[in-house]
Curated annotation (Swiss-Prot):
Lineage: Bacteria, Pseudomonadati, Pseudomonadota, Alphaproteobacteria, Rickettsiales
Protein name: Peptidyl-tRNA hydrolase
GO biological process, alphabetically ordered: protein quality control for misfolded or incompletely synthesized proteins; rescue of stalled ribosome
Molecular function terms from GO: peptidyl-tRNA hydrolase activity; tRNA binding
Subunit annotation: Monomer.
Site entry: Stabilizes the basic form of H active site to accept a proton: D92
HAMAP family: Pept_tRNA_hydro_bact
Binding-site residues for tRNA, renumbered to this chain: Y14, Y65, N67, N113
GO cellular component: a single term: cytoplasm
Function: Hydrolyzes ribosome-free peptidyl-tRNAs (with 1 or more amino acids incorporated), which drop off the ribosome during protein synthesis, or as a result of ribosome stalling. Catalyzes the release of premature peptidyl moieties from peptidyl-tRNA molecules trapped in stalled 50S ribosomal subunits, and thus maintains levels of free tRNAs and 50S ribosomes.
Cross-referenced PANTHER family: PEPTIDYL-TRNA HYDROLASE
Amino acid sequence: MILVIGLGNPGIVYQYTRHNIGFIAIERIANKYHLSFSTKQKFNCKIAEAIIDRQKICFIKPTTYMNLSGKSVILVKTYYNINYEKVFVIHDDIDLEIGRIKFKTGGSNGGHNGLKSIDSIIGSHYNRIRIGIGRPQNNHDVADYVLSNFSESEYKTVMQSIDNVANNFGLILEHKLAEFKNKIV
């Protein structure tokens, strides 16, 4: 089974914020496969499960708020006995320009509180799909920035990148990670 986690904060107030780009992306990917999410209280998340191209897949959106995402991840990972190489986390990254996508396995959390939470519970040896949200301008507070909405042009750029990830997601299901990495650049 493949586990795909989209990071974000629950609630309508956060729905289109920069920090919720993981939720936005995972919903777009799930929609591509005509899946919908349902709440699973025992996992502290919203979940969509399917078999796609003979591959079991589980998409989750933790409902624990960003800083506690690891609690949801460990519950699902343990329940389904999923290995690290089959765990993919989609998240915002302020160190990448808006709309830029990078894929990597393992590494530092870069100060991202959702990744810190996951790392503290399961370690850092999982896959990451990083979506650039850019850095704040004019010494703007980072916390305020990540919780702000995109401008219309920024949102359009980010959605084009997310569509690129969704359109190439089948490569992950086929275990073609190098090809996926090259296609999403």
